[in-house]
Amino acid sequence: MSVLVCGSPYDLGRTSCTCRTFRTLAAVALRQRAGLCSGGDAPLPEGEASWTQLLFWRERRRPRCGDVLAAGRMHSAFADAEGRLLTCGTDDDGHGFLGHGDEAAGGSITTPLPLESLGWPLVRVVAVAAHTMHSLALSADGAVFAFGQGRCGKLGHGEEATEWLPRRVVALEHEHAVGVAAGQQHSLVLTREGGVYSFGSGFAGKLGHGDRSNRLLPRLVEALRGVKVAAVAAGSYHSLVVAEGNAYSFGDGVMGQLGHGDRHEHLAPKRIAALERIQSAVGGENHSIALDDSGALL
């Protein structure tokens, strides 16, 4: 057993060849060592294709807790299985979206690095969002943290200052958040009760408040009051929400990304009549994608 736990790839290979019973255990150990980048190259020992293929299939089917990630223009954010928040990327202009303090400004972090200032393990991150110049993190207890460039109020802190470290959005302390989304200059937060808060740039009405005004603090989207929202998504200049199988969109529609059959901007959420039985949606710079309950992409 000690060989399986800490043996070298060569020891593990010899073990698998000595006894067929140990082949699956040896293969698991080799895959884990390779996944942790320890021990160098660790090819699977030779054997019948059937058991190695079965093992690989089982690994692919196994639930994973660490697949929480988001991509901005020049950075990425991750949450591992233990709830640690990690980021990597390049912040040449010093916008703070990596969350490692001003000492990281003007440089690159090429390997995901934990954000120690967030206070893990007291704060465990379960969701992340990122866009060009800011990042959002959601903790297991429903708290929202924002950092990066604060222009237009997209961090929700009531000001436009740059935040070099993750800072809790105090205005949402009375809510239990379950989802976050980051757009070009705006942010969306979904609460446990199905409410949606938006803040940041109001360009083209993408905050959903019926106007084009910026919001420095989170504000509840009143047009969605009474609608049980299940998911939120932010494109660069538009926003999407999913509720009870319906999809709603608002903001800039110049490229048809709102799905309403026109190219107009919509200042408040409007249901997309062409979509039904929708499970989730995502927004890009000038397009939107929805997934229905049959697994079809639209």
Task: Describe each region flagged by the PLM.
Residues M1-L298:
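Eukaryote-biased RCC1-like beta-propeller repeat architecture
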